[in-house]
Amino acid sequence: MLRHASTISENSSVFIKLPSDNVRFVTLKPNNTIHLGKFGSFLADDLFGKHFDETFEIYQPKKIRVLKTREVQYIEEEKKTNQELNDCRGNQLMTQEEIDELRANIKAGGLRAEEAIKQLTNSSKTFEQKTLFAQEKYVTRKGEKYLQRFQVLRPCVEVVANYMIEHDPYKILDLTAECISLMLTLGNVKPGGRYLVVDETGCMFLGSLIDRVAGDCKITLVHPNEQPNSSCLEYWGQDFKEDSLVQKGILKTLNWYQVTNPTETLSEYSVEDIPESELNEMKLRHRKRYETKKATFNRLKNTIDDFESGNYDALFILSIHTPMSVLQHLLPKLGISRPFMVYSTYQQVLVETYHQLSKWDNLFVEKTAQSTENDEKVDQGDVAIDTQKEKVIMLDIHEIRTRPYQVLPERTHPFMTVRGDMGFVLSGIKVLTSDSNLAAGRFPKRKGQKETSSVKKAKLEN
């Protein structure tokens, strides 16, 4: 289990939100100084033991304190408007040199940011003529420039996804937090499950899945390269790194060659057993090399055997490859009545996959041993082979769109600019068909059934 700490500790991975709404990723190492540019700097040791999601203020050079929350003040309506005001540089009486001097004093700790903002408002010609709403807006905008405050955010799906969308959206295939949440919900992700994942988003989705169940799951990751690209896992901390997840038994990795050619792969990595007597006579470096190769082979064999056994609880595909080329190898490994999801930034790709999956079927062979009278060992001839077909049902293509709103008294409205492309998800469920004809409804009774029912009625009357 990967449990989240309630307080900040050494070597914690955190996100720092600045007054300008920009977010920075920082690993808090002991005896280290965190620089926030024009917003100042502070010692990482001062954050240890503090709670996440709190807002801090740099009140002196490299010294911070928790900022107390203030009560929301409701502003009464007024008849004054801003129609007659002109927004120009001449409204500010302070020169640029004086403003630069204010910034230098704030950074040096000789002047508080609140006092500097007050000087700016006092030297503005039009500040008093503005409405109360406009005045608050002006102060807030100046606070984004001068206030030396920051908020420490805990790594989670929303924070990491928004950070990657702002910095490198192509690396994660434009995957948003809303899309991740939808896929986890459709996949019925819960603790204790086994999941098959194809993740080419830098393991952005993989980290979200593990975070959702706090590491209580078994995941097989299929990747196209020699080693998986897990660059996004570091944003959740040291416990989420690939080596740590493999060591804890949460993650197993296979590349496409190992998936499509398991026998050839095992033969390439196979190591002959050496007796203990010969091992004792070997040089130390040769023995270590042999033990490393043997451990690698055993680990790979266990991973391939686990993959070949199939019966996964859900299948998630986030890849740049054609979805059907991936599904034809992995869909047979999915358990019966289990969901699968395919993510793509293009709807047409999923529409073609939708039509191909509607015609898809796979031969399902199940061997069942017939019982004998003496309950003896079942021979090969006593094994019955039940052949059925696997199909997919409930195919659907979901378009992800969210509309954030500004929620304020008498000023609630949607944001004017939002992302227009949030991706598409194809979902479905794999089922097992039956050879017999199934029917439901009310049907007329046969002659034999009518006679039997009449006899039962006569007995009841007697």
Swiss-Prot record:
Q: Which GO terms describe its molecular function?
A: tRNA binding
Q: Out of the domains of life, which is the source?
A: Eukaryota
Q: Which GO terms describe its biological process?
A: tRNA methylation
Indicate where this protein resides in the cell: Nucleus
Major localization listed first in the record, in broad terms:
nucleus
Query: What GO cellular component entries does it have?
Result: nucleus; tRNA (m1A) methyltransferase complex
The record's similarity note reads: Belongs to the TRM6/GCD10 family.
Q: What is this protein called?
A: tRNA (adenine(58)-N(1))-methyltransferase non-catalytic subunit trm6
